[in-house]
């Protein structure tokens, strides 16, 4: 759109109103507003007569000329103009109800001048406007067009004011010339000092104006570019759209009129924006939010706009490209003329196109610096420039010259005649494991934009339900909450902007529109950044999150075989492509990768576990080398994140290129830190709350030199706060790195918790701001125990919810100590950190502790003791009060009983939190007190198969009293370490909990996963006298024995086969098959078979002996529905003759996806009432931990993955009524897992599984977000399939075997 007035074009003698305000740094005076009002009204009337008023009046379209005139330009960003558009234009009108252009301009002009009058005015301070001017502006900004004053009446009011001011009033043009002179004079001075070699005065002025505008806005760090970046120049036509002032709305006084502030206005808070707000006389409204940046960038305006129906990246993609010039020192110092420059198109993540003027010899790094400076990005580590080839993105090195990768003809031909378009894309190259690691909201927004587009373009796999949920979250982020005035069945958004085309084709656009609208209506209120953060939380759980996929071929080049390599920060994934779906076949983590090499077109990965070489063929040697460099860069990024360096520090990729196949001893000598990390299986994961501030890093706290008094200083001086994201603050926590001793010859690190003096074995913790760390010693009371009640954190589904003190028992030891307060988190007990401990593990640890315990607690600052208000708040947050607990009879004296007692306590609803948490029953096991005079040790708790338990053994004669077998160098399944035998009368036999066949998971904090047999033995025979073991029960205990020194339990008990000790599939499958059995033949179409299925767990119905696979939904117009014989709820007994009996979820999924075109299903229709009805509504996934990249370790050269899935993911429940995306309440719980079958780009999660998910139920759940409406549903299971492996089971010291359902477990000591 061209400027529509004769002075509209941006020239050397014209500036925008926004530029003048930014340079000036303060609001317009009253006389200046009168002058602008007069000149603008005249110009608008003239443009309306000439039918040339096709523009929106706003601070960026109002051009002030040096001659003292005012005009308007039409070349303004839609995002910037939107807040000043009249409401009737935003709402849309029918063809026969065209709005009055004059009235729309009146509204926009009034909003623009009111915006200028409130520029940089504090929220609490009223505007200094006289009554006549204030009344005119308020009348111009009326919501209803018929209530606004006309342009003629505005002119008349200006003439009346001119007569009343003075005998000799200053001309209106004089105020305009002063504003223009302020800007142009400033530019001239800076121009002379900074830029001397540029041949274009216009381009210098554009660049310096933009730099000045951005530099003067200091209220928002994100609005300023890093000083180290090279400057760039923007053409005059695009300068003022980048950075502009934003006023604070303040008091409107002395007026009988009212002003409707649209939610599109900058500075308004979300609640008031949504409903609209009337600012009337005598009322004070502080609509400005200090969290919003002063400079309203496109990002800021997008968050505060109203009734937008299109996403940001679609709106900006349709606009004309903005011209960006590289700095003069780059393109002109060699004497290059302007015409010798070439046009390079750079597409930003928000869809905006930049036309970069550059030299043919310019480097990618120079373009990257200019583009990121233009986009105001600060955390540059994660971004890169890439070009597209065959629908794949290839990132460029910063030193690469553009002429080396430009298309043919781009270098030779001048820009005016060149028909070859050279396009680069600014994209995210390195993905963080959690958005909390991103320090700036603008960076998080860029992640949101890329993931949003990748899902829409089907580059990132999602199943159907998650696609719909993400569509709703994107709608909330970009549109807002469901409009109250919305008429049912009337569309208010474009379906294709939020849902991928394949799903629309499968479900029909009308049905998608209805379902998304209904989910939007019922979803909890979210707005702006909060919705974006929730969007990121869900996408970061997807198995393909952060994976850069490139097509490769097998070494034998079979035409029917399609393969792809996925490279991410954790390693390399090998995919097999079938039916447009990617199936993960192999996974190589960096620690399992011995060598990556290339030779011509061949790309080879050598496994350090099996020694096998896996060779793939690329389309060219250049691609092969690129994949090697990409692996090196991703490995380096992962090492940088794991080392605790600040994420904004750029790292040198060359430091991580060396990936030779060294021996373990050599690797240990050369890189001890990496070797320790590899052995500990930590995979360099960072917990989100372990960030420091801007100079942050990993808060590494050891058990050394714990000093309570010094913790306050450390907390005040050395700790930065975790980033706040929206209304949700990520609470910081201490990272407990347990002391490790390392020997390059012996191999694995051995924990030395007991080596050295007692002081050296203590941990130091650093208090968060507003909190303190206390150390207290308690003595057990025979009646009240230790006198406090503990519970798991409010959000127990996350990776480390923590152990908290919910209340203090009156008269107990804790109350007498006068230092413990409810709500405090127990960090350590008897010098053992509780980080990563589950509730049950903490219960056993406290119950088995001696009569004197030492606690390290982090609690809020204040007077010690029990504050009734604090206790009330604490118990309200946890949902369990001490009174409630005592009413159940759970007092400390119960622990003196000599027999095991199992009690079922019904979970209480969380007080004060509207959350879709289904009721469930949780079993607590209590351990008796140790009896000194008992000849028989206390009977241990009943531990079910698959449960993890904690044992502390004191060595006798240097032994623990049991032998082990297994290791990755043995034939034991999955390379685990198992208890082979129990020595009669030894420490293990006396303790009584350990059984033959149990799997040993951890010894003194050292994870045994991935270790050889010798290394595991070395861990067990470490120097410490007390060994703290974490084990997994493999077989149920048949009888409890009271062993003594004379018992021959080990001899009498037959050896347990390690194979049979592993939980296997049921020997038989007794399905509900009383109904008729029938066979159906289906033929796949482009969308698959056209149905989704769920796996119903046997725990959901008492009469089931095995899992059932049931059809959940039939998609309209697809083969399953067209067949007519299949109905929702039918049981799938077999697929192509292979029975589903005993198969786990992933195997059924792969069985259906890998089937040929014609599929034969053996179905059974259960009798009515035999099984619960399937819920067809949508459910909300648990917004939980970031998935880990994993692959199973094989001892042979297996070609299919061995993947583990956490046992707890098999538990699912339908939500109760409340907030979230669940639509209607359900009283019954269902244990189901669902997979949508029929999406043309849907990727199954694994090709085959060789063992059941019960094998490793202790998988770690990292970075679990604290969310008030977290649920575990079938969606979560879909998200988490194929995300775990034996070698990546858990992070150091973290375990989670509880149900992912949010629960509150309490006990008293």
Curated annotation (Swiss-Prot):
**What this chain does, per the record?**
Functions as a scaffold protein and likely plays a role in N-methyl-D-aspartic acid receptor (NMDAR)-mediated synaptic excitatory transmission. May be involved in synapse formation in cone photoreceptor cells. May play a role in the regulation of tight junction formation. Binds phosphatidylinositol 3,4-bisphosphate (PtdIns(3,4)P2). May play a role in the regulation of NOD2-mediated NF-kappa-B activation in immune response.
Q: Protein name, please?
A: FERM and PDZ domain-containing protein 2
GO MF entry, a single one: 1-phosphatidylinositol binding
Q: Report whether ATP-binding shows up as a keyword of the record.
A: no
Q: In which tissues is it expressed?
A: Expressed in epithelial cells.
Impact noted for substituting residue 727 to W: In a colorectal cancer sample; somatic mutation
A Gene Ontology cellular-component term: bicellular tight junction
